[in-house]
Amino acid sequence: MLLTYMEVHLYYTLPVLGVLSWLSRPYYTATDALKFKFLTLVAFTTASAWDNYIVYHKAWSYCPTCVTAVIGYVPLEEYMFFIIMTLLTVAFTNLVMRWHLHSFFIRPETPVMQSVLVRLVPITALLITAYKAWHLAVPGKPLFYGSCILWYACPVLALLWFGAGEYMMRRPLAVLVSIALPTLFLCWVDVVAIGAGTWDISLATSTGKFVVPHLPVEEFMFFALINTVLVFGTCAIDRTMAILHLFKNKSPYQRPYQHSKSFLHQILEMTWAFCLPDQVLHSDTFHDLSVSWDILRKASKSFYTASAVFPGDVRQELGVLYAFCRATDDLCDNEQVPVQTRKEQLILTHQFVSDLFGQKTSAPTAIDWDFYNDQLPASCISAFKSFTRLRHVLEAGAIKELLDGYKWDLERRSIRDQEDLRYYSACVASSVGEMCTRIILAHADKPASRQQTQWIIQRAREMGLVLQYTNIARDIVTDSEELGRCYLPQDWLTEKEVALIQGGLAREIGEERLLSLSHRLIYQADELMVVANKGIDKLPSHCQGGVRAACNVYASIGTKLKSYKHHYPSRAHVGNSKRVEIALLSVYNLYTAPIATSSTTHCRQGKMRNLNTI
């Protein structure tokens, strides 16, 4: 059956591109837009000239009645193909690469000689190949088409290997998958089109060898090499953006650089970062970040996994925030350390916050770390150093509010009434929700007004209450047995019930009573949720899916608790498969729950327990 070139796009390439675009939509960021614009511009301009050259020399031909128009020597649909292929491969590569932080594949500690060899050997081989191919590309000869492909692709591959070769070698599976699947798909489209007579490859300028019927080896080589160029280009941009994100210092008054710089300025900065070898980068920065993420990974595997649905730069900063919260929480919760020592460490943390917000830069070198090194654990110091990079985003008030929550627990103060419950929950949960929201809003494509920012933050703080109330409702027995604590308002309880719960005997107040208390708290959370979940729609679109997923998964615990009628579970739990289902549907805004949830809050164990059970 004869296919027109436009039908090839309508039936094959565009539907797949549409699916990839839909899958990528929740994660689409300004960095992705930059990738698409830059790589498409380069691919289109270079491929247009190259393709006109080979068509002029009759290496590739098309059915004259199968195209809508010809520009130069090349059909309009072929120009479309350059753009579609670039968008398709880059979109797929983004989906494959996004699940790990790009900065983890930059290694300043790598020996210089190793880096020189890893760069020099492939670059030399690629340039020699390009040189020989240039001289073999004689029009009308069997090696013409294949040689043209090699001299076109190999110099670009050499350049990209110079800037990102080691980075890509550290994630080989992701790179290979990103190259292989688009290549196989486009080869299949090529087989269909050649078989249908849409276009053809001249036997006079090719070897006449086929990988499979209707797939000349030159066509396979073209798709494999050009997809390799596109994947290498995507990885190179990922690496440069990771470097810029870590090493471009920001003042409290400076927005993220990609929002305030022109396209040309961004390209110039990226060129600078592209040329930097790993060894000139500050290794302590990567060490501190790695330690912070180890804290996150060990403390909450669930949140570590769930954070993958956020864009890389947002995910990195949320992870740093979590590590700081966890590290400071551990300072106050470590029962092996005397209470007085923990109180002194809390005072020290207050001093760190004052020092941090008393400076005019986010650079960790502005802090006198020798003062803290002698009094805090090494892991805590690393978390603090990474946290300094959030100086330009956060405000001191929310951090100090969180520290007030730690003080409440250190003093083992009781929650006497509803007002105490709200105050404590605001300290340990709303404060974190506010900080998460400020991080997310800092990565918005367009800055929100002051009034709108305050409204969104208020919704996030309310969501903090929702999640903390759910947390307390779920852990009445656990808090009693493990901590000897009662986080329920004491004016909800009799003196005997308070004594039983604080004595580790919460079960003895009865199953129905436990259910009644937990449901009462959940229903309060439900009422707050009605207003709190409105904030999500005002967040940057590329973060809404992640926030929605995290909150919906946690709110499902409240739904689970309400399903119990006769027995209060020690720890209500939503199964892994159900959590995955809720998270995936939430990312694409397809999840419908009894109570819709959204916002940007995570809480700590006993204080931060929410994050540990997502």
UniProtKB/Swiss-Prot annotation:
Positions of region (Lycopene beta-cyclase): 1-239
Segments passing through the bilayer: 2-22, 36-56, 70-90, 120-140, 143-163, 174-194, 217-237
Localization (cell): Membrane
Mutation effect (E78K): In strain: MS21; loss of lycopene cyclase activity
Region named Phytoene synthase: 246-614
Record has Transmembrane as a keyword: yes
Protein name as annotated: Bifunctional lycopene cyclase/phytoene synthase
Native species: Mucor circinelloides f. lusitanicus (Mucor racemosus var. lusitanicus)
